[in-house]
Structure formats: C-alpha cells, structure tokens
Curated annotation (Swiss-Prot):
This is Protein lin-7 homolog B. Induction: Up-regulated by cell depolarization and calcium entry through L-type calcium channels. Keywords: Cell junction, Cell membrane, Exocytosis, Membrane, Postsynaptic cell membrane, Protein transport, Synapse, Tight junction, Transport. One of its GO terms (cellular component) is postsynaptic density, intracellular component. It is a peripheral membrane protein. It comes from Rattus norvegicus. Expressed only in brain. One of its GO terms (molecular function) is protein-macromolecule adaptor activity. Residues 93-175 form the PDZ domain. Belongs to the lin-7 family. Plays a role in establishing and maintaining the asymmetric distribution of channels and receptors at the plasma membrane of polarized cells. Forms membrane-associated multiprotein complexes that may regulate delivery and recycling of proteins to the correct membrane domains. The tripartite complex composed of LIN7 (LIN7A, LIN7B or LIN7C), CASK and APBA1 associates with the motor protein KIF17 to transport vesicles containing N-methyl-D-aspartate (NMDA) receptor subunit NR2B along microtubules.
Length: 207
C-alpha cells in the first residue's frame, strides 16, 4: 500500500507563479516578451495536462522514501507517460464515480490480441457519457495508478471492477489505431466465417 502523503497543490502554485509574472511585467524590471511567453506556457492546456498526470501518479504510485524521492520518481513516470504518447494526443486524467450502474463504457484489445487496450464504446446515457471526459478511441494507459500498457484484457477488467468510490483513468486519444485494430478483428472474423461456411458446404456435398 502507498504511504499517505499530503495532497499536492500544483494548480495553486501555478496560479501564484502567473500572478508573480504579472507583477514583474508591471514593474518593468524584466523583458516583457519573455515573461509573457512563460505565462502562456503556464496557462496552456499542455501544462494543465502535465500537471494532471503528475498529480494522478503522485497520489497513486507505491513509493517509499522522502518527499524528494517520491517527487523524483513521479517526475520520471510522468515523462515516460508523455514520451510514450509522442506523435499522438497527450495523456489526460479522467475521474469517474463508481456506482451500481457501472462506469458506462466498453473496452477491447489487450496483450493476448497483440494490441493496446482501448475504449471501444461509451454507452449513451451512462456514467462516462454524462461525465463527458472519456471518448471512443481513447487508449487506456492506467487505472488508479496501475499501468495497463502491455497487459492482458482481463487485467484491465479486474482493475476497473475492483475500484471503489471512483476510478481515475489515464488515457490518450488515438482513434486511428482503434480503427485499424477493429478492421483487423473484422478481417479475422470474416476469414473464420468463410472457413466455417466452406466446412459446412463440404459436409453437405459429402452427404
């Protein structure tokens, strides 16, 4: 079990940094162009995505040691998550309440199918649909801090079922890969149907 840690206040810290930059701009002590550029970075969606993933990993990683050790390990894990998404959408954190009606989405793929695990359907009117943060085509990277990259389908299902109260998902949107995966599965199903039809026809001709 991960040790209890003080919750992070990174959003508050970023807001304070932005306020400081605004004061420095008014003072005229530093070149305003550079200050404005830094302010835009801190207020960007990319910075928010990094902060959300960092906070999610910091809260859930099972790490013992000082706050400095924990922060260093979390930073490495955050960099790894964004490096893995290079060329794709950046990771996002989606938190959903866990209720008796389920989470309201389906997944497909897994190690046994030689593919990532994907959100294949968001059920209309379900929890995920009402929340609005999850999309068909999202690749599932982790469930409550446990990575499911390279894992079997059943591992992700077990983690989702075991979640209590709420579930935090780290996902990234790569719909093209899902479409390719679905096309591959459909091709395999069509080949099986043709084979079954051929076998049935052969049996009929013998009869």
């Amino acid at each position: 079990m991960a040790a209890l840690v003080e919750p992070l206040g990174l959003e508050r810290d970023v807001s304070r940094a932005v306020e400081l930059l605004e004061r420095l701009q008014r003072s005229g002590e530093l070149p305003p162009q550079k200050l404005q550029a830094l302010q835009r970075v801190l207020q960007s969606r990319f910075c928010s995505a990094i902060r959300e993933v960092y906070e999610q990993l910091y809260d859930t990683l099972d790490i013992t040691g000082s706050a400095e050790v924990r922060a260093h390990a979390t930073a490495k894990a955050t960099v790894a998550a964004f490096t893995a998404s290079e060329g794709h959408a950046h990771p996002r954190v989606v938190e959903l309440p866990k209720t008796d009606e389920g989470l309201g989405f389906n997944i497909m793929g897994g190690k046994e199918q030689n593919s990532p695990i994907y959100i294949s359907r968001v059920i209309p009117g379900g929890v995920a649909d009402r929340h609005g943060g999850l999309k068909r085509g999202d690749q599932l990277l982790s469930v409550n801090g446990v990575s499911v990259e390279g894992e079997h389908h059943e591992k992700a299902v077990e983690l989702l079922k075991a979640a209590q109260g709420s579930v935090k998902l780290v996902v990234r949107y790569t719909p093209r890969v899902l479409e390719e995966m679905e096309a591959r599965f459909e091709k395999m199903r069509s080949a099986r149907r043709r084979q079954q039809h051929h076998s049935y026809s052969s049996l009929e001709s013998r009869g």
